[in-house]
């Protein structure tokens, strides 16, 4: 009971819920309906109000001007009431166009009568009249129809009146009062000026009508056609101003009209239809007005963008030819676009930088374009930076080479490392073209002439030779470039003072070029700076900056430690060059205060040679003037020339060599003496650091005076003499070469005599150095662990003395250049000093200054040659002490004092003696080698050396070391290890021959590929390939393709000197997994071979050539095949012989005869034949005959006609080469008299290659059953004569006999080809006869001609006469044409051909049996019926029904073997049996066959057939008629085999037919 009540309650609640849901839905519907109704009424009221406003604004037409105005008004008033009746049948040209609508039923107007008329020239006057209508919709529709009809009128000259009426109808609606001139014509110039100035009032409320928006839209759709019609017809020239005014008025309209006007202007500029005056006075000012009115206003950015694009097209389309007007009026406003906040505006403006540079020259490019390009390449929007990359090369082409190096090159490298993948991708695409701009033929020896690379000897630059002019700037005259050097007023540049700075920089560049003209240093005399010195210059600058910040505030030391940890940590370190590490230090120093007084003070080195009193007197002034830090004075990390260090030479020598040292010095601290005033300003930490670098302490004035007459030390060449722009006071200089003497019998001679002053100075310096180091260790005590083992304590004192001597022992030798270096070492067992030497007693070699890596002074060396150094940052002393201040201090754990047998003192910090605590020492502590013998040390042993692995990771290997590293890798891992895992570094690229190209650009290019395996795995690689297109393998792949495409340009720019580095990139590109990359290399390998020469081509390019030849991709193989000759000609003779042996490997697979599988590779066979024709000139006739003749004859029988035709040319070339080489011997051996023989006399057994080759041709082509081969032989003969490979006598000897036989061939195509060959032979003989006559007297007679030529001409003429009567009409026509008996312009007479075809038909169908009527046959001969053959119908059995065929299928197959014959159904009565009554012989006329035929029958096949027919006729006469005669089966149907009753039923069909014959005749 309770459950039922609960269920009832639930049911009621559910019904109640449904009711409320329904009610809510109903209420919602009412609300929405009411709202929609209100909105609809509101929208309708707004629409009606707008309609009324638009109608009130439209002007009324009061008077109509023109000849057709009266007619127009009359025609407009015709009945418009038929509009309701027309309904949907109204004529509409365009689906979007609608005819004028009726406002309401009460306000109906008459419809124009042309509304349902065709749109042609007959109704055009009525339509023009309707354009004057007061009704806006009618006028708009009429305007559209009028313009549509005008475009269909052709030619325009016949409809000039209609065009004039149309232009007047448009002109009358111009919304302003026309200003008339004295001749009562519109003064358009005055109207244009007032319209531009805004003083011309546009009427919108007057009675004069105006052009509506729809009319303007229709006009702009047809504006190109209207301008073209006006320009092509002089009668319409006066209306060009009308159209121009419409364009200008549209620029002042609403946004939609403006957009259409801009589009129309772009179309007209593209077609060059706008007048120059109109462009200057109307279009350009109007476009700038639209652009500037939208800045900061409520205007669509799309409209502004279209306006900017139109302005850029003014430059790109060269629409204005006045350069000065553009420079003064266009450029200032254009510069405002470059700082527009809209990204798209800046992008569009960037695109025309290249056009502006070509237009205004080099000076303008450097003053205006380069600053803007650099600024926009740093834009916050990546799309703008991407466009900057795209036009970077175009701008660089217009700039000077110095601007490219100093300004553009660093910024381009920054774009290569852009964080956005698209920017980096585009930059790497442009990297190759940008590098190619630095090409210098005088250095590389490669020059472009007419698009071809020409190799010439490099020219050493003479002192008077200035910097080479850029080829891209050759179009700029000097006067034109100077005209646009000064920017016009109101031109915006990125910074206020940037222009002055940039002009100053350009001035300094000009001064540099002037200095280069006067310098006496040539490229050949410039030496490569030492790599260790360059590294130390950069590291010293970075340490200098860190010291300044470290002294200023202690928290900055953590950042120094962080940078140092980044350099040393193996997990964070990447195998980049040391320059990248120094860049990080430079970034750190940029954040510090540039005016820090705690940095290295700057002093003038000119005062370093003065006396002590002068130094002390000027000390205060120099401190005040040079209190700024070194970072503020140095422009880069390598520029330390502001730090004054003393030279150890006399003032006179310094003055004499001032000009030389300004160009050739380097900033290495080794061997340089620090100025006294500078030394006094250094703290103890900086002093210790400089002393460890090999710098000498300040000297006393007395010592200066003593050695004032000493010669100046050797100066080191500068790093880049081409980049030095001004003379600078240098920081460091090299000391003289050091010579170490051994303590032998001449001990007294090698030890220099030390004066008392020198010994006192020595002692003072030792004391000073000891105090300084002790103070330094005390100050840095908390940072270093001074606990030591007992073993280290015992040797600390002696080691400390040794370390002190390492800094001060060479002080005196720096002053005397020619004095030998004596190193005094105090032995542990004796107190005497001994002199040691690194040379043998018999030969004493001086120690050269040109070390491969000079981190330290020459007083340091590795303790053992076998003791290799660990990689950079792997030392435990540095890893365990992250608080270490520099990487250099961490490297002391592997160094020691030269020839010191014990460990160093505790002054090295954390781990005490570095020798005992070094990780390598601990590993080899049990078997530590003894110190090397001093007498066996070479000069290179006295320097600090790094192992090859460490130098690879630092990127400082030279060429020899890199080659050694490659060879070692190849010996372990093979060739793949060399090409995949070798690090491509370019530190050594800074040679004298490669200083014309910025190193960073080339290094970036070489690091694109990186390890092949690294790019795919995504980790482990460290080249630029891992940073470009991160996360997008497709972009990486595309970058590799561009790298391969630009490789020839880079190779051309760098020359042969850079090939040891480019070789690795080349191999990786050739082994790339992408077919397109390999394809680019295969298509350009011949150009690379041209640049590199024979030796490099043989060693490096030839293996790659073989690999690409066997590539699986056909496009790659095709690139190798196309340039086969171009590559082989750059090989040495030995390699050429190897190449010709591999020619069969180029033979395509589908070329073998009988291979029908691959017929699509015929283009490869075609290209192979053309290349072999060129290769004949590179080889001897024996090689050509042995290796190329077989390929030529094989491809001469190819299936493709193009291949055969090209093979014929190769055969002709080979024949010519062989005959030319052996003809003289053949004439003597074969006894050829008078240059002619009829039969070859080969009694002599001497074999000639030419005769053997010709015999092969004759036997393979002329005497064969295949007619295509015989035809090819005729082509070979004709080609030999065309190419003049043989003269008339030679051709008569080799080819005349088989050619005469083929002239009577049974195939018409062969006779036709032989006719062409005979024609060429005849022309050759006639030319030879004319030449003989010119050589004789003018009155020579035909009898005096050589008998051989005259007889050959007669022979050929007789053969041509026979061919002129040939049965084939084509062969006959060619023969007559060759004899001059017919003309090409005369029609061909086909009557004879028709007669011959009828004769052939009658001969073929002369006597056959045809079906005459149902049940009988007829024998027909021509048109006459010879005999009727009747058939007995009783003997014919009916065929089985079709539906029962399946039932008897098995029985048919079972009795197939026993069946004698199969009867035909009664409806099939056919006979195609040829019979012969008489003894007439009918041969198969093979002359009529115009296709390939089988010729396997014997010569007596025709006689056998005749005998068979005669035997059959004789047997048929003896056979009697039987009841069951059979028909001749034609297409027998399968039926049941009848029972065989007698032997007569199994008689042959011919017998049956013969019996019928007998019956009929009886």
UniProtKB/Swiss-Prot annotation:
It is found in: Cytoplasm. GO terms for biological process: embryo development ending in birth or egg hatching; establishment of mitotic spindle orientation; negative regulation of meiotic spindle elongation; polar body extrusion after meiotic divisions; regulation of mitotic spindle elongation. GO terms for cellular component: cytoplasm. Residues 98-110, 761-775, 1501-1523 have a biased composition (Basic and acidic residues). Disruption phenotype: Embryonic lethal in 10 percent of animals and slight increase in the number of males produced. In oocytes, slight increase in metaphase and anaphase meiotic spindle length, persistence of microtubules around chromatids during anaphase and delay in spindle assembly in meiosis II. However, localization of spindle pole marker aspm-1 and the shape of the meiotic spindle are normal. The second polar body has a larger size and in 16 percent of animals its extrusion fails resulting in aneuploidy. The size of the polar body is further increased in a mei-1 (or646) mutant background. Residues 646-661, 787-802, 809-818, 1481-1500 have a biased composition (Acidic residues). Its main location: cytoplasm. Residues 838-847, 907-937, 1541-1562 have a biased composition (Polar residues). Residues 1479-1528 form a coiled coil. Residues 605-627, 708-724, 819-837 have a biased composition (Low complexity). Gene3D superfamilies: Leucine-rich Repeat Variant. InterPro entries: ARM-like, ARM-type_fold, HEAT_type_2, PP2A_Regulatory_Subunit_A. HEAT repeats lie at residues 330-366, 369-406, 408-446, 1062-1100, 1101-1139, 1295-1333. Residues 1531-1540 have a biased composition (Pro residues). One of its GO terms (molecular function) is protein domain specific binding. Keywords: Coiled coil, Cytoplasm, Meiosis, Repeat. The keyword Repeat applies. Probable regulatory subunit of serine/threonine-protein phosphatase PP4 which may play a role in meiosis and embryonic mitosis. Probably in association with catalytic subunit pph-4.1, regulates microtubule severing during oocyte meiosis II by dephosphorylating and likely activating mei-1, a component of the katanin microtubule severing complex. This is Serine/threonine-protein phosphatase 4 regulatory subunit 1. It comes from Caenorhabditis elegans. The gene is ppfr-1.
């Amino acid at each position: 009971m309770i459950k039922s009540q609960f269920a009832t309650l639930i049911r009621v609640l559910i019904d109640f819920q449904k009711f409320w849901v329904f009610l809510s839905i109903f209420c919602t519907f009412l609300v929405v309906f009411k709202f929609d109704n209100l909105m609809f009424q509101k929208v309708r009221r707004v629409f009606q109000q707008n309609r009324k406003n638009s109608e009130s604004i439209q002007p009324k037409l009061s008077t109509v001007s023109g000849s057709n105005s009266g007619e127009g008004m009359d025609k407009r008033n015709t009945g418009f009431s038929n509009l309701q009746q027309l309904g949907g049948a109204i004529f509409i040209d365009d689906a979007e166009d609608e005819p004028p609508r009726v406002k309401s039923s009460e306000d109906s107007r008459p419809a124009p009568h042309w509304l349902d008329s065709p749109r042609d020239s007959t109704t055009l006057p009525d339509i023009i009249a309707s354009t004057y209508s007061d009704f806006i919709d009618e006028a708009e529709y009429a305007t559209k129809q009028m313009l549509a009809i005008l475009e269909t009128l052709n030619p325009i000259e016949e409809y000039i009146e209609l065009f004039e009426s149309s232009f007047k109808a448009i002109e009358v609606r111009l919304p302003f009062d026309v200003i008339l001139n004295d001749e009562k014509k519109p003064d358009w110039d005055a109207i244009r000026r007032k319209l531009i100035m805004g003083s011309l009032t546009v009427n919108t409320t007057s009675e004069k009508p105006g052009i509506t928006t729809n009319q303007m839209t229709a006009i702009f759709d047809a504006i190109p056609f209207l301008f073209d019609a006006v320009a092509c017809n002089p009668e319409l020239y006066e209306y060009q101003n009308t159209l121009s005014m419409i364009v200008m008025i549209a620029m002042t309209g609403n946004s939609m009209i403006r957009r259409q006007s801009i589009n129309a202007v772009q179309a007209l500029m593209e077609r060059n239809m706008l007048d120059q005056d109109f462009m200057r006075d109307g279009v350009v000012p109007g476009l700038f007005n639209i652009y500037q009115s939208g800045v900061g206003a409520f205007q669509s950015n799309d409209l502004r963008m279209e306006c900017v694009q139109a302005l850029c097209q003014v430059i790109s389309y060269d629409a204005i030819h006045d350069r000065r007007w553009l420079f003064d009026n266009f450029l200032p406003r254009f510069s405002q676009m470059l700082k527009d906040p809209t990204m798209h505006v800046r992008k569009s403006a960037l695109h025309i930088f290249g056009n502006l540079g070509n237009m205004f020259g080099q000076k303008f490019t450097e003053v205006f374009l380069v600053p803007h390009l650099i600024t926009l390449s740093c834009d916050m929007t990546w799309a703008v930076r991407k466009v900057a990359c795209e036009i970077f090369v175009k701008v660089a082409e217009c700039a000077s080479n110095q601007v490219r190096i100093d300004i553009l090159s660093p910024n381009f490298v920054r774009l290569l490392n852009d964080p956005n993948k698209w920017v980096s991708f585009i930059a790497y695409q442009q990297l190759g073209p940008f590098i190619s701009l630095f090409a210098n033929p005088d250095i590389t020896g490669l020059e472009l002439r007419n698009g071809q690379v020409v190799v010439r000897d490099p020219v050493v630059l003479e002192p008077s030779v200035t910097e080479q002019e850029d080829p891209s700037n050759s179009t700029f005259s000097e006067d034109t470039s100077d005209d646009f050097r000064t920017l016009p007023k109101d031109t915006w540049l990125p910074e206020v003072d940037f222009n002055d700075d940039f002009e100053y920089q350009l001035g300094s560049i000009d001064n540099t070029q002037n200095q280069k003209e006067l310098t006496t240093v040539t490229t050949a005399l410039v030496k490569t700076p030492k790599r260790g010195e360059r590294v130390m210059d950069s590291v010293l600058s970075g340490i200098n900056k860190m010291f300044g910040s470290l002294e200023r505030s202690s928290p900055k030391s953590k950042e120094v430690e962080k940078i140092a940890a980044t350099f040393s940590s193996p997990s964070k370190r990447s195998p980049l060059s040391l320059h990248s590490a120094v860049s990080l230090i430079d970034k750190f120093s940029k954040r510090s205060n540039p005016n820090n007084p705690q940095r290295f003070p700057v002093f003038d080195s000119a005062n370093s040679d003065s006396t002590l009193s002068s130094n002390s007197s000027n000390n205060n002034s120099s401190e005040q003037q040079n209190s700024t830090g070194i970072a503020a004075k140095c422009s880069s990390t390598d520029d330390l020339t502001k730090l004054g260090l003393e030279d150890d030479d006399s003032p006179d020598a310094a003055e004499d060599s001032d000009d030389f040292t300004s160009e050739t010095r380097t900033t290495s601290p080794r061997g340089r003496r620090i100025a006294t005033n500078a030394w006094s300003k250094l703290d103890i930490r900086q002093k210790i650091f400089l002393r460890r670098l090999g710098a000498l302490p300040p000297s006393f004035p007395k010592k200066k005076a003593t050695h004032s007459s000493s010669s100046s030390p050797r100066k080191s060449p500068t790093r880049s003499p081409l980049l030095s722009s001004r003379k600078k006071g240098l920081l460091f200089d090299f000391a003289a070469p050091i010579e170490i003497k051994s303590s032998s019998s001449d001990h007294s001679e090698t030890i220099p005599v030390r004066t008392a002053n020198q010994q006192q100075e020595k002692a003072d310096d030792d004391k000073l150095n000891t105090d300084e180091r002790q103070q330094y260790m005390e100050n840095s005590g908390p940072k270093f662990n001074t606990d030591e083992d007992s073993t280290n304590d015992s040797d600390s004192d002696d080691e400390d003395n040794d370390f002190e001597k390492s800094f001060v022992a060479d002080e005196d030798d720096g002053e005397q250049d020619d004095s030998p270096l004596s190193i005094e070492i105090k032995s542990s067992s004796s107190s005497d000093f001994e002199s040691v030497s690194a040379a043998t007693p018999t030969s004493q070699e001086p120690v050269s200054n040109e070390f491969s890596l000079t981190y330290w002074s020459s007083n340091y060396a590795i303790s053992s040659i076998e003791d290799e150094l660990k990689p950079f940052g792997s030392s435990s002393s540095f890893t365990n002490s992250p608080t270490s201040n520099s990487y250099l201090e961490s490297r002391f754990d592997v160094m020691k004092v030269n020839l010191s047998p014990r460990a160093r003192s505790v002054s090295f910090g954390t781990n005490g003696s570095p020798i005992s605590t070094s990780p390598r020492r601990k590993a080899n502590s049990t078997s530590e080698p003894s110190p090397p013998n001093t007498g066996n040390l070479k000069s290179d042993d006295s320097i600090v050396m790094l192992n090859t692995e460490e130098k690879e990771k630092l990127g400082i290997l030279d060429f020899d070391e890199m080659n050694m590293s490659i060879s070692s890798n190849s010996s372990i891992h093979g060739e793949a290890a060399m090409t995949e895992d070798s690090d491509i570094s370019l530190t050594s690229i800074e040679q004298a021959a490669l200083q014309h190209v910025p190193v960073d650009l080339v290094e970036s290019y070489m690091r694109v590929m990186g390890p092949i395996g690294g790019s795919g795995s995504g980790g482990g690689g460290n080249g630029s390939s891992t940073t470009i297109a991160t996360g997008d393998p497709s972009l990486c792949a595309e970058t590799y393709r561009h790298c391969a495409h630009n490789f020839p340009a880079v190779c051309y720019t760098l020359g042969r000197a850079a090939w040891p580095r480019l070789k690795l990139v080349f191999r990786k590109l050739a082994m790339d997994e992408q077919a397109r990359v390999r394809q680019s290399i295969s298509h350009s390998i011949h150009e690379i071979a041209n640049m590199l020469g024979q030796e490099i081509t043989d060693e490096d390019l030839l293996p790659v050539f073989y690999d690409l030849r066997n590539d699986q991709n056909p496009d790659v193989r095709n690139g190798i095949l196309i340039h086969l000759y171009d590559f082989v000609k750059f090989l040495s003779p030995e390699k050429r012989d190897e190449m010709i042996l591999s020619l069969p490997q180029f033979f395509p697979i589908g070329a073998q005869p009988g291979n029908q599988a691959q017929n699509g590779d015929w283009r490869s066979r075609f290209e192979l034949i053309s290349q072999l024709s060129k290769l004949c000139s590179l080889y001897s006739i024996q090689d050509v005959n042995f290796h190329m003749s077989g390929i030529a004859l094989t491809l001469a029988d190819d299936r493709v006609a193009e291949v055969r035709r090209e093979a014929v040319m190769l055969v002709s070339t080979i024949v010519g080469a062989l005959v030319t080489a052996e003809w003289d011997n053949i004439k003597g051996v074969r006894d050829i008299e008078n240059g002619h023989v009829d039969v070859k006399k080969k009694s002599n057994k001497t074999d000639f290659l030419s005769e053997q080759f010709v015999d092969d041709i004759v036997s393979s082509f002329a005497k064969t059953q295949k007619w295509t081969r015989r035809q090819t032989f005729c082509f070979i003969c004709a080609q030999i004569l065309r190419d003049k490979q043989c003269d008339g006598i030679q051709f008569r000897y080799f080819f005349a006999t088989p050619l005469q036989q083929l002239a009577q061939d049974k195939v018409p195509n062969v006779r036709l080809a032989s006719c062409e060959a005979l024609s060429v032979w005849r022309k050759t003989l006639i030319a030879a006869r004319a030449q003989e006559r010119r050589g004789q007297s003018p009155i020579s007679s035909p009898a005096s001609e050589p008998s051989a030529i005259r007889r050959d001409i007669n022979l050929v003429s007789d053969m041509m006469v026979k061919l002129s009567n040939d049965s084939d009409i084509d062969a006959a026509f060619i023969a007559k044409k060759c004899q001059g008996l017919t003309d090409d312009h005369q029609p061909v007479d086909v009557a004879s051909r028709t007669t011959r075809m009828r004769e052939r038909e009658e001969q073929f169908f002369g006597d056959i049996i045809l079906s005459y009527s149902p049940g009988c046959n007829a024998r027909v001969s021509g048109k006459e019926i010879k005999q009727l053959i009747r058939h007995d119908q009783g003997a014919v059995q009916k065929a089985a029904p079709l539906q029962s065929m399946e039932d008897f299928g098995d029985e048919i197959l079972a009795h197939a073997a026993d069946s004698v014959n199969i009867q035909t159904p009664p409806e099939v009565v056919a006979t195609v049996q040829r019979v012969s009554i008489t003894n007439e012989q009918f041969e198969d006329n093979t002359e009529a066959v115009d296709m390939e035929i089988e010729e396997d029958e014997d010569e007596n096949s025709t006689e056998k057939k005749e005998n068979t027919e005669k035997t059959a006729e004789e047997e048929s006469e003896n056979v009697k008629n039987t009841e069951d005669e059979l028909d001749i089966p034609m297409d027998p149907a399968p039926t049941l085999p009848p029972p065989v009753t007698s032997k007569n039923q199994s008689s042959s069909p011919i017998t049956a037919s013969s019996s019928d014959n007998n019956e009929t005749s009886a």
